[in-house]
Amino acid sequence: MCNTNAGRVNMVINHSAGRLAVGKFGWKAQVASLVDFSADALLNEMGITNPIFRTEVCPQGNCRALDFNPVASLNDDGRAVDELNNFMTLLAAP
């Protein structure tokens, strides 16, 4: 079986810039920028909403659990996204 996308550039939405861009990060280059990667990680791994990804993810698919969210507004003003982005930018290559 042949992969028809092998060797092709993956164009994805750069959420922080609001435009189409080349995917560079994440599984199969599905994220365009390290800022988007940081914001996505905060939301999906830790449940922290931020200016780039504002919508809560239903815990384990149970959206009724969001009724008990003590903070209905954004959990981060963008500072955590910037700090995580800076941390990953300054990490040395393995």
Regions found by a protein language model. Name each.
Residues 1-94:
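Periplasmic c-type cytochrome electron-transfer domains
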